Amino acid sequence: MLAKRIIPCLDVINNQVIKGIQFQNHQIIGDIVSLAQYYSQEGADELVFYDIMASPNNQTVSKKWVAKIAEVINIPFCVAGGISTLYQAKEILKFGADKISINSPALLNPSLIQKLADHLGTQCVVVGIDAWYNAQLGTYQIKCFSGNSSRMQSTTWELLDWVIQIQQYGAGEIVLNMMNQDGMQNGYDLKQLSKIRKHCTIPLIASGGAGTAQHFLDVFQYADVDGALAASVFHKKIIKINELKNFLIKQGVEIRLC
């Protein structure tokens, strides 16, 4: 059995780590390089960096901070933000990232997933999904350009259909961001994650809702995800990664201790 992964998420604007609630009302948390170094030393299994304004502003993530992070941490990290071509993806990997993640660019051009997988290998290609539950319609809507509330828009994709399509194109991993839970700290969307897990044959990372150590245990036990991504609880030091890992090990979860 592969060890479950604990993954701090760092949303980035102008080289600063920020955090909001339900993808809005962002507050500055701190310096991106310092926080990356801190989480690496704390025992994170990997890090994910989202330049959340890149795609909405037709920009690409800054290679400068990617290179700086590669110099100061010794764990894998994934980078997302406006990566819409093979050349851009290669550049990010060349500057030190282990994986690249695409979200809005994949929605705009699904064949990009296959192109990246064919040239870089599936192990390097992550697809992020931002899903918002519309209670009136009773469906999970896939959002595009979710980093900028003024440009964010719903797509015509149903969540499950998009998950299946992503896999057919050759994605190596999916990060499923449940937007309703984002920053709320009231637990992951176990019901929906469990449903998606049944149709997902590649690694699935849960995102949105972590508030306690029990929430991590629940998402591993009930949704059988491969990794749990979180931001607020780590940034605010509500949960320390080494303490979380010790708790999970005592509960029988296979996890790496650093």
UniProtKB/Swiss-Prot annotation:
> One GO biological process from the UniProt record?
L-histidine biosynthetic process
Source domain of life is Bacteria
Q: Where in the cell is it found?
A: Cytoplasm
UniProt cross-references to CDD domains, sorted A to Z: HisF
An example GO CC term for this entry is: cytoplasm
Q: Which reaction does it catalyse?
A: 5-[(5-phospho-1-deoxy-D-ribulos-1-ylimino)methylamino]-1-(5-phospho-beta-D-ribosyl)imidazole-4-carboxamide + L-glutamine = D-erythro-1-(imidazol-4-yl)glycerol 3-phosphate + 5-amino-1-(5-phospho-beta-D-ribosyl)imidazole-4-carboxamide + L-glutamate + H(+)
What positions constitute the catalytic site? 11, 130
Q: Mind listing the UniProt keywords for this protein, alphabetically?
A: Amino-acid biosynthesis, Cytoplasm, Histidine biosynthesis, Lyase
The molecular function terms of the Gene Ontology recorded here are: imidazoleglycerol-phosphate synthase activity; lyase activity
**Enzyme Commission number, as recorded:** 4.3.2.10
Predominant localisation class: cytoplasm
Fetch the InterPro entries from UniProt: Aldolase_TIM, His_biosynth, HisF, IGPS_HisA/HisF, RibuloseP-bd_barrel
Give the record's pathway.
Amino-acid biosynthesis; L-histidine biosynthesis; L-histidine from 5-phospho-alpha-D-ribose 1-diphosphate: step 5/9
Please state which protein family the record places this protein in: Belongs to the HisA/HisF family.
Q: Please explain the role this protein plays, according to its UniProt record.
A: IGPS catalyzes the conversion of PRFAR and glutamine to IGP, AICAR and glutamate. The HisF subunit catalyzes the cyclization activity that produces IGP and AICAR from PRFAR using the ammonia provided by the HisH subunit.
> Partners and quaternary state?
Heterodimer of HisH and HisF.
What is the designated name of this protein? Answer: Imidazole glycerol phosphate synthase subunit HisF
Gene for this chain: hisF
